[in-house]
Amino acid sequence: CVIVLDALAAATREKLCAVLQLTDTGLTPGSGVGNHRKEVSRRTLGVPVLALGLPTVIRAEQLVGEETPAEGEPLFVTPRDIDQRVRELSRMMAYGIDLALQPHLTVEDITGLLG
């Protein structure tokens, strides 16, 4: 099994840095922001893929309710404190993955491993 993590584009402001998407169908990096990359899935790798995604960006027009001009590139924004949020959320994800894969470890053990 391969575990992949990716940043996602949020559909709503409320989901920005607030939800975690978990799927066994893999992912296509960049697809939420129009920058499609090669799919990472069971079909492409030949093994099960568990994908975790965290919405860290949102289209500006979703915040203001307007469409961007057709000739312009879409504008994506992040919260002002995105660096801190990503540090905290990635740590939370690391704890979850470690506890799921190594159930014999305690939270204290994992804290020692993560530093």
Language-model-derived ranges and their functions:
Residues C1-E39:
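Glycine-rich phosphate-binding loop
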Residues E39-S41, L45:
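Short amphipathic alpha-helices and their capping/turn segments at secondary-structure boundaries
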Residues L45-G115:
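C-terminal functional extensions of proteins
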